[in-house]
Amino acid sequence: MARKFYVDQDECIACESCVEIAPGAFAMDPEIEKAYVKDVEGASQEEVEEAMDTCPVQCIHWEDE
């Protein structure tokens, strides 16, 4: 079972870095212009961690932290 994570959409600035790094896990919502998690199993933990580290506003978080 994949470790769950989420995007804090209040903080997201729609830079799309997470989508570029892990397109299987993240997508952009065109209506609100924010990133969201489309599939928690769509990327490896390493890819998710890279997306977290690359996010300029640090709005991607593990659900259990």
UniProtKB/Swiss-Prot annotation:
Keywords, alphabetical: 4Fe-4S, Electron transport, Iron, Iron-sulfur, Metal-binding, Transport
Gene3D superfamilies: 3.30.70.20
Keyword Flavoprotein: no
Coiled coil: none
Co-factor requirement: [4Fe-4S] cluster
SUPFAM superfamilies: 4Fe-4S ferredoxins
Disulfide links within the chain: none
Sequence ranges assigned to domain 4Fe-4S ferredoxin-type in this UniProt record: 3-31
The keyword Iron-sulfur is annotated on this UniProt entry: yes
MF (Gene Ontology): 4 iron, 4 sulfur cluster binding; electron transfer activity; iron ion binding
Membrane spanning residue stretches: none
Cofactor note: Binds 1 [4Fe-4S] cluster.
Residues reported to bind [4Fe-4S] cluster: 12, 15, 18, 55
Function comment: Ferredoxins are iron-sulfur proteins that transfer electrons in a wide variety of metabolic reactions.
Subunit structure and binding partners: Homodimer.
Name of protein: Ferredoxin-1
